[in-house]
Amino acid sequence: MKPKLVLGLSGGVDSAVALALLQADYEVHSVFLDIGLVGAEDARRLAESQESPFYVIDIRQELERHVCTAFAADYLAGKTPSPCAVCNPTVKFPTLFEKADEIGAEFVATGHYARIVEREGRACLAKSLSEKDQSYMLARLPAELLPRLKFPLGELNKEQVREKAREMGLFVADKPDSMEICFIPGDDYAAWLAERGCAAPEGNFVDKDGKILGRHKGIHRYTLGQGKGLGVSYSHRLFVSRIDVERNEVVLSDGSDLCTQTIRTVESNWLAPVCGPVTARFRHSKTEVSATLYIDADGVTVETATPVRAPTPGQLAAFYDGDVVVGSSWIEG
């Protein structure tokens, strides 16, 4: 008898291929996490085509409590939030594991591009073998969940996944990827904040000496290091150097002050022992840099071998030993 497994099935090509691959070795139960938008019918059709029991779980209240409220608060605090890195350990995976425990399933799987590998008898989160690696967004997961996790796409790239979907005759083979924040259709987070009554008021752009350079449209519209869309004419290009929440000011500079080799982070989550120098990634899209971690009771001071441009408060710092994620911590600001 095959072991039971719960799969997060979104209705996209990644989780669809994950379902088809897992069917060979597991009794797969498919779960669609409902946030009140589209996708459920595609997920249902996929589950039915694979004869996989299908469940819809409404996660809107949990998403609001753990993700949306914090997302809005971070922007009003001058930070740039990373909602997926928050949702995975607080909403998505807890919901899937709760369903797994309810039906007696030993394992949980998703279509993320990541791997679970064994190191010294420990299940570890590791990077996928493709450029679409999503281990950064999973770096806040509790270590105790890792032995029960499966990521069947971890050794595939996106084109291989689409090709498998075509070979399998899956109707979502050429379905476009979702590039937006799932709870903000159109990715217009400023409009979403305004609808919630959370938009920050207009204020001044200033230089480091306090000289007014122009007017900004609300601090929530800007992120550290931003150089586009400022609407300020000047003798040279300007970048967001700092967001002063108390004064409702956005400080601009020529960008020379944005690079640093010392980054303070807080609220650490450890997945594997740190045995020496690591590499660190400070944003999902950024490349890694060599670093040394100085760990204390409140967080981590990260010393990088080369300067890092604009490590942004609200973003995650993920730490790697080779391909293995050893931990993560939030960039302080």
What would you call each of these model-derived segments?
Residues M1-A139, K150, E159-Q160, V240:
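ATP-dependent adenylation/nucleotidyltransferase module used to activate substrates
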Residues Y26, A109-I116, G121-G333:
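AMP-forming adenylation/ATP pyrophosphatase catalytic core
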